[in-house]
Amino acid sequence: MLENYQNPQIYTYSNYDEFHDIQIEVIPSFIAEKSAPQNDYYFYAYEVRIHNLSDGPVQLINRHWVIRDGSKRERYINGEGVIGQRPVIEAGESFEYQSFCPLSTPTGNMRGKYEFKTPS
């Protein structure tokens, strides 16, 4: 059974907010060696890339994620910044971070938003 989950079909996501000139890319990956399908445990990692395409700096202040497994159970992740940081992203620069998301089903999805402000 485990071999069926070695290379699941995974979709990357990119969104561009034309009004604020911020582009967000999310690149998920299935981590087979940390997963245990026989125990309904599927481990996914993801990389987030935030590109500031505006003319000035922005600061990431909050994140709001909804993680939904294949059984439609949802978890909510809300908090200040990401990975303990509230990064200031200069004009033309990017910020990247990695995190993970274990699921109890082989499929699922994530959606959410980031809140930014112009640093003082």
Locate the predicted segments by residue:
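Membrane engagement elements in two modes
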Residues: M1-F43, D55-Q59, R68-S120
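Asparagine-centered strand-capping/turn motif at beta-strand->loop junctions
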Residues: I50-S54
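Hydrophobic beta-strand segments
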Residues: R63-W65
